[in-house]
Amino acid sequence: MSANLVIVESPAKAKTIQKFLGKSYKVVASNGHVRDLPKSTMGIDVDNDFEPKYITIRGKGDILAQLRKEVKKADKVYLATDPDREGEAISWHLYHALKLENKKCSRITFNEITKDAVKKSIKNSRDIDMNLVDAQQARRVLDRIVGYKISPILWSKIKRGLSAGRVQSVALRIICDREQEIDEFISQEYWSLSADILVPGAKKPLEAHFTGDKNGKVELHSQKEVEELVNKLKNEKFEVLSVKNGERRKKPPLPFTTSTLQQEASKRLNMSTQKTMRLAQELYEGVNLKGKGSIGLITYLRTDSTRISEEADANCREYIGQQYGEEFVGDKKSVKTTKTGKIQDAHEAIRPTDSSLSPAMIKEQLPRDLFRLYQLIWTRFVASRMAEAVYETTSVKIEAGEYHFNVAASRVKFDGFMTVYSYDTEKSTMNAAMKKITKDTEITLSELKAQQHFTQPPAHFTEASLVKTLEELGIGRPSTYAPTITTLLARRYIVKENKNLYITELGEAVNDMMEDGFPTIVDVNFTANMESLLDSVEEGKVKWKTVVENFYPDMIQAVEKAEKELEEVKIADEVSEEVCEECGRNMVVKYGPHGKFLACPGFPDCRNTKPYYEKIGVSCPKCGKDIVLKKTKKGRKYYGCINNPECDFMSWQKPSAVRCKECGGYMVEKGKKLVCADKECGYVTDKEEEK
């Protein structure tokens, strides 16, 4: 009989830990949470100090029964769930569900699933940290109140199956605000000018960029300005004003936090946040390797910290010295650090548990995506302990009368950390002409080249950039980024096309209603402050029920007001002019998961359906037929000709009936402005003036 029972969340984690502890321990899994708030009711006794009413999760009864049998056999129980709020709460629920009050029971935590870390945690066992549990309870209760009270309003005012969330709704607003910025952005024309400079003895010319005159930067806004400048410059003598040679050092990147791992995995590996976290969980809990059995390959994956333990730091530096040479070992004093007030800084950064276990050594034993993620984590960590990269730089200033041009070039002198982390490698721009040129070099103008540009709107959010923005604004924590994005996609509030996230018509409707009825809930500062309060609960500075108590009255007041004042945005069956070709009835407008469509009112006898096209009252500039609002397969709105495919007109911006006064072309709406669709024209006017 095993004298010691260790309870973890997952079978994979149990298998890995069992190997380390031997026969005197039995390691079993709870398969995640065993108790939660009920699904059928709010499960919070508002009149009794917001006491949660936890119940056994459906399907977990058999697991608990088996765990109780194991508890009876054991002399001591160790609760070894994950080292964060959620893990602490699972341990607390297990403690009560298994009635461990009269049993020798301890809480153990480890940042990595290795033999040394697990055995050390048993020596340093402790009681359950109720501050951590209370922080999780506060988050769970707040999220339940928001979801349970607001979601039914969305059901009644828009459609069933929708949801609101404390973090989810703010993230949706952030995406909506960005889409509005993009829609209202008015592109401005500007020009750049460069000069090809001939240097004696060099086959290829230098490309020097116009920077301005002696008084500073000069901006070029039109072709006319450029032509005037070019005519002046053709009559000027080009001379070298100065040549500066130097060095530039590039610091290695910090090791990964949850946020930066999700961002880099999205950019480098094209992985969603959800997939990144799933694979990282596998790497953390244990992977089977030949000769080693099941072993945890990385440290805990939910962290805000870039801190590294002294032991891991020393081991990695030793590995770098042996594999690459001592000159590649980074200076401890030059290692970048980050300061964070967030509570998760108690953890280390995400790193390999053994830096000597290189990706090449285990490539054949891991599935492709698991290997790619491990490789990314390993290279980032090893690079963070390596020396800076050193660049040789040359900067040349050129004078042409009163005007200035500049050339800057660099090449790698010492690779440093880029030997491992090739993502940060910069292409060498040093050519023969740059090496030959001095202040006394006689140079000659070969050609002046002008290029037209247009200012670009802010970029659409990607999963990576949204995670970065949420973190910068203090919205959510490492455990919430991926589930938040997953929920928004699942509810079809947003869609993803070529990595970009776009708001859908449904997402706009939900956000508009949240802004009208619950402005506090979708306020970025309010949500960030709430996260700070939850951190304060974890630190023992604030009672969790006080946080909920202060939040609840205003929330209920907003709900009551919204129920009375918010108008429905869903439309009853609207009869269209479209006639059903199968039965002759006028078709009606219906709402489905992807928005509006036309259906025959004779259903179920007649099941005919058609796409719904909303006319905007503007004629197609190509064929004269109606322009209609359409959607891509993923739900993104655009405007196209009803005569498609015979006519291929389309526009992402809403076309206007007003014609451009400059070129006669069609114009599109950009917020309060009308802008000519022809960028070469660029005519802009106010919408109000054209009414």
Task: Locate the predicted segments by residue.
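Conserved short loop/turn motifs at secondary-structure junctions
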Residues: 2, 82-83, 159-163, 245-254, ...
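Short acidic, hydrophobic short linear motifs in intrinsically disordered regions
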Residues: 240-243, 251-265, 292-301, 457-469
